[in-house]
Amino acid sequence: ALETLKMFEKKDSRVKSAAATNLSFLYYLENELAQAANYADLAVNSDRYNPAALTNKGNTVFANGDYEKAAEFYKEALRNDCSCTEALYNLGLTYKKLNRIDEALDCFLKLHAILRNSAQVLQQIANIYELMEDPNQAIEWLMQLISVVPTDPHVLSKLGKLYDNEGDKSQAFHYYYESYRYFPSNIEVIEWLGAYCID
């Protein structure tokens, strides 16, 4: 696959940009960040308006820890194609890294409007509300999440924990027990259920 993509490097700028974008992504997945960055640069230089190339460039910059610069690449990708969900998702993650929680939430809420049943987006929104110390909103978004992935034991145990923190032991028991049914090896869940039964 790499050899085939490398053949396209000699083509016109759009084809070269697409090939370099794919090569950058492949190297990124293989954790060869230097090569990924080189091909991301080639992709962006070949076609500055390619949102996938800009997103890949943002990913390589993000992986090197320069979150502000990564955010700029993601924003540029979105200016070129406002429907680039990868750039919007990664911009939200970048804002979370930068502790710009309100901006991260805004990104994920926009994504939710586009991708209504995306488990990843719902989980990010719930997590942000948890970071904002708003357990009621976190619970509401986790409830939407379990309508998409009803057997996820980690989401169920997270709901149990939030209800427990809110003092609702019966709901906490329900979600911890559901979590236990799907993943009976989680020690934290077993300990909570044991303590609940002793009380």
How should each PLM-predicted stretch be described?
Residues 11-12, 46, 80, 114-115, ...:
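Structural marker of alpha-solenoid helical repeat scaffolds
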Residues 29, 63-64, 97, 131, ...:
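Register position in tetratricopeptide repeats
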